[in-house]
Amino acid sequence: LMGDLTGSMSAYHAILKRKFTEICTTLFQLIPNLRIGIIFYLDHGSGDPYITKVQPLTVNVEQLQSFILGTPDGFGGDEDEAVEDALHDALKMNWCEINTHSIVLFGDARPHEVSVCPYQHDYFKITESLFKKQVTINTVYCSTGSDYRRQSSLYEVEIGNFSRRVSRLGNPEFFSWIANVTGGIAIGVEQIDDIVDIIKGLAAKDAGKIDELEKEELKITLRPIPALVHIKKQAKLIEERKKLLGFG
């Protein structure tokens, strides 16, 4: 899990504080050999308490919950946020510990261009390196009222196509690009509470457990969850495309 904890995202952090144990319980029951890591990020030089905070991959739910509760929100500086620093941290994660390499990235702002990042982190090259490690990046664009079904179509690119560099994309377009180019799903948030179902759905999707999650959620809600239905539909299309391209 990777997420923006600047001021505009405080409501999402509050939901994670309340609901993360529920998310973990569901996913650990569904997915064998699951490990969860967390990377939170803020911005550079804005008086914030950190740029990124990392919880390495673990099966310890109490440790994960403690990390979420103990990591403070920040303010953020300019409009762009330190997404590139978080991606750089993700590159250093011990991915060999797990079979399915998957990130769920949530936020509402794009990264800095390499010329602006104090550490010269290049999100384009880092994303390509993550893709080569077979890491899928799913994104949740956190702007309430956005149509979750349209997010993937805002920047269409072939899976694995890094031949053309992107730069200075708009915020929603960045979240669309990074998901599409790594074979992930980009989804928007219509209501803040939706993020819980979306995180569970995206994680279950990459582990091949979306059907099982849907059945479990139906027992509770007694009705299909639109975000899960959308994720399942998109996942099928992406898997077909991956096979066509030789990634499946």
What are these regions (language model features)?
Residues 2-248:
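Divalent cation-coordinating acidic motifs and surrounding scaffolds
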